[in-house]
Amino acid sequence: MRSVAVVPAAGSAERFGGKKLLATIDGEPLLDRTIAALLAGGVDQIIVVVAPEAVELQHDVNAFTDARVWTVVNPDPSRGMFSSLQAGMAEAQGDALVVLPADMPFVQGATVRLLLETFAQKAAIVSPRFNGKRGHPVILPPSLRDEIRAADPSLTLHDILKRHQDQRVDVAVDDQGVVRDVDRPEDLPGR
């Protein structure tokens, strides 16, 4: 099974007040931690979707010097995160499509691995649940790729997934990172 992750990273980070994905946690950029969790979880390829002007972010991704990690540019990120997901899905060719927003650096690699293992057994839409709350990453079957690409960019992934409730499988995890993102500087540890 070939897994491909799409990591939307083209947002403006207005609530954070600047370059959120390059902010550090224990000396490591937030985006790098998100990518590292996906690699540790066994994802085969990672597509990071960036804004056209995000040169520093592109350099950060390119610093991985890992052919499994590369960028795609969302030509109009002002249309929202779903448009970044669509841009990434246009390039994603895999049996399991992993969606993890870039601002979720607390997800554990073991959680990603567990979700992929569950997907391999059930080939459904697989989501983690922490304390009863659904989170990310979400694993999608390739059958949803074209539906996502063709959808109106004003929609959300949640809108698409609501159409497929009968295909959803939730996995209880002991990983708060699946429901913890970074929106403001105070969301980072030690601040």
Language model segments and positions:
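Residues that scaffold the ATP/ADP-binding catalytic core of kinase and kinase-like folds
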Residues: 15, 95, 147-148, 190-191
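Short beta-strand and adjoining strand-loop segment in the mid-core
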Residues: 86-88, 143-148
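Residue-level recognition of oxygen-bearing side chains
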Residues: 21, 30, 111, 143, ...
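Conserved nucleotide-sugar donor-binding
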Residues: 94, 135-146, 185
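Nucleotide and nucleotide-moiety/phosphate-recognizing core
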Residues: 2-134, 166-173
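Short, well-structured alpha-helical patches and their helix-loop capping segments
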Residues: 107, 132, 136, 140, ...
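Short beta-strand-to-turn element immediately C-terminal to the catalytic PLP-Schiff-base lysine
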Residues: 23-25, 139-141, 181-183
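Conserved alpha/beta core of the MobA/IspD/sugar-nucleotide pyrophosphorylase nucleotidyltransferase superfamily
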Residues: 150-191
